[in-house]
Amino acid sequence: MLTVTVAQDGSGDFASIAEAVLAVPYEEEALVQVGPGIYREKLVCEKRCITLRGAGADKTKLVWGDGGKLPHKDGRPTHTFRSYTAFFSGETLCVEDMTIENDAGPGAKAGQAVAAYVDSTRAVFRRVKLLGSQDTLFCAPLPEKEREKDGFLGPRGLAPRKPTAQYYTDCEIAGDIDFIFGGGDALFENCVIRTVDNHISHSYVTAPSGRADGLGFVFWNCDFVSDCPPGSVYLGRPWRPEGKTAVLDCRLGAHIAPEGFIAWNDRTDTGLASFAEADSTGPGAAERPAWVKQLSGPEAAELLAHARTLCRPKAN
């Protein structure tokens, strides 16, 4: 395995993360060891098999500030999918012990502001903080069709849609509107899901858009926390009619609305979307609408086992 080091003080092979990633040949398995510091960079990482390892989420920080409403260098608005701080693609990705942040600010000012755009076929995030406001984490792929002109403008807007399997463990993910969204299959274990109070009427944690036969987003043993007013945050709304989110054995703060989930305006057929829950605890646990499925113990165990098989990294 190729190992390269990044240090802002000049003691490493490179002084920036982008330079280090660019130096890695696509086909070579590589570890990029990133030292402490705030790296103000917009990163594109497209490698076959790469690990980015920081010195700790509070020590190694990758930060950028593009927002969907802000102007792009081509004269058009940046839009959602060019706003990323980090874009990841390739076959196998692992990110550990660092923060990836989009600090463009709240959506009212900056628009959608993606911290991590994850398009790798298989991706693992361990002990990572993903911080932002609107649209913090995009779990690719995109839906098949955009609803607005230039809505999918970005690195994969015209590419064939390919499934991805993503695994997040011991991470913190923060934002306010649809801050975990997309069509990927993703399992979140032992994570803190933090809704930021940007003084808006309602917030939404997930906005899935996956396939009818896909897994969607599964959360297990996570803490949903916030300083938002009680009952003002929904666990999810379907970005596309067949979106799926399941919340299993999680602790829900008082900010979670009693309904739990909500339709996406009048565009949602709740008969197609799949929202499910099992054994939620805390002030945000409540009786849900009939279209939110309450899983039995065996059903929840089966779903979790399937999610782990699909999304957890394979043993060598």
Tell where the protein language model's regions lie, with residue ranges.
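Sequence-level preference for short, compositionally simple segments enriched
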Residues: 2-316
